[in-house]
Regions:
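Primarily recognizes the serine-hydrolase "nucleophile elbow" in alpha/beta-hydrolase
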Residues: 157-229
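C-terminal catalytic histidine-bearing segment of alpha/beta-hydrolase fold enzymes
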Residues: 292-303, 328, 335-377
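Alpha/beta-hydrolase active-site loop
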Residues: 115, 142-163
């Protein structure tokens, strides 16, 4: 019943994108194209002022795009030099436009508003990028790390260039998908931001590490291990991201009819309802595939370039917070990533908590707040 409406919307979105490509290509990245009010669901309680900006950025295959972000200002008069900026890289909400953080707000409302409200109360302005294709024309290349880094850096560049009350000094903070985005941002912030910005460091909680290793066995004979429905949703989002970034792979040809149907459903369903639907239908990951993904030539190399976290090249301090009861990411892999960074002489510190994936976010604040304060000191 919704297919004709969706098809029409996609057609209009594509036409809109094509009509605007010359403008996007001519606009320097990190430029505000428009600014307006945020929906109530996306407005952080306690913010003295909030806005939604559209800005120029980069998406898959270095194509120019328009992305969106929410900007939150703390109460009171800004200090000399402007409010220091926290770039908030949010966790997975879905890949459809209706799921965008600056449109629908967070999926974990109480958790995220408590977390961001704490940063706001410390005198930081917050710039929350949606990532390319979320809430704006085009597809969202889910977990494409370099694209996420571009989007986060360009959002900060756009906001600080547009609002004179914001400082050029900034740090990035992220959770889950956003922690991966924060780590990629940490690797490329100085390069992508250039002399216009003063990048100071990064915080990541629940960081998904070495996903490229975890995805290698996916295929029709994956054992029916009991997984969270949200984990199956993540797989579908990753497959959609690969389809967007590497159309030549013909990802659909590796899927069963049911797999292709779920891939299509995941394109528009946000995380929580998609997880509920997958759980209600008792979907098993192996049932999605008609042949192993490992048949893709150089699959591990391709995945590493797409979503593998960089193991060196960081020029500012990194804070990794990990819950020891976290089952949304593979905790031993995150701990291994921290150990690899330390062995490689990277400026990282690891903090662990007796919490799950979600609980670690606010539990980390007693450690991450002073860490970030020192970055701006």
């Amino acid at each position: 019943m919704r297919k004709p409406v969706i098809a029409a919307a996609v057609t209009l979105a594509c036409a809109f994108s094509l009509l605007n490509l010359p403008t996007a290509a001519a606009t320097p990245v990190g430029t505000v194209e428009s600014a307006g009010a945020l929906a109530p669901a996306a407005t952080l309680p306690g913010a003295a002022q909030s806005s939604r900006i559209l800005y120029s950025s980069t998406t898959a295959n270095d194509a120019p795009t328009t992305a969106s972000a929410a900007v939150y200002f703390p109460p009171g008069a800004p200090p000399a030099g402007g409010w220091p900026v926290i770039a908030w890289a949010h966790g997975t909400v879905g890949i459809g436009d209706d799921c965008a953080y600056s449109v629908a707000g967070p999926s974990a409302v109480e958790r995220d508003w408590a977390y961001l409200g704490t940063w706001l109360s410390q005198g930081y302005a917050i710039v929350a990028a949606d990532y390319a294709g979320l809430g704006t024309p085009g597809e969202h290349p889910y977990l494409n790390g370099v694209v996420e880094a571009h989007n986060v850096v360009d959002a900060v560049k756009a906001a600080t260039g547009h609002y004179s009350s914001l400082s050029k000094k900034w740090a990035v903070v992220g959770q889950s998908q956003g922690a991966g985005a924060a780590i990629f941002t940490a690797r490329y912030a100085t390069e992508f931001g250039g002399p216009e910005l003063d990048y100071r460091g990064a915080v990541g909680t629940g960081t998904p590490a070495y996903i490229e290793d975890i995805l290698l066995p996916l295929g029709p004979h994956v054992p029916p291990v009991k997984l969270s429905p949200h984990t199956t949703a993540y797989v579908l989002y990753i497959l959609n991201g690969l389809r967007t970034t590497f159309p030549e792979l013909d990802i659909e040809s590796y899927l069963t009819d049911a797999g292709r149907a779920w891939l299509s459903t995941a394109r528009t369903e946000c995380l929580l309802p998609l997880g509920d639907e997958l759980g209600a239908n008792r979907v098993i990951v192996g049932d999605l595939f008609s042949k192993p993904l490992a048949q893709i030539p150089d699959l591990h190399g391709l995945l590493s370039r797409y979503l593998g976290l960089p193991e060196s090249g960081y020029d500012k301090p990194i804070f990794l917070g990990q819950g020891l009861r976290d089952t949304d990411v593979i905790t031993p892999e995150t701990l291994r990533f921290a150990a690899v960074l330390q062995a490689n002489g990277q400026p990282v510190q690891l903090h662990t908590y007796p919490e799950d994936h979600s609980g670690t976010v606010n539990a980390s604040l007693p450690d991450s707040l002073p860490f970030v304060a020192r970055l701006f000191g």
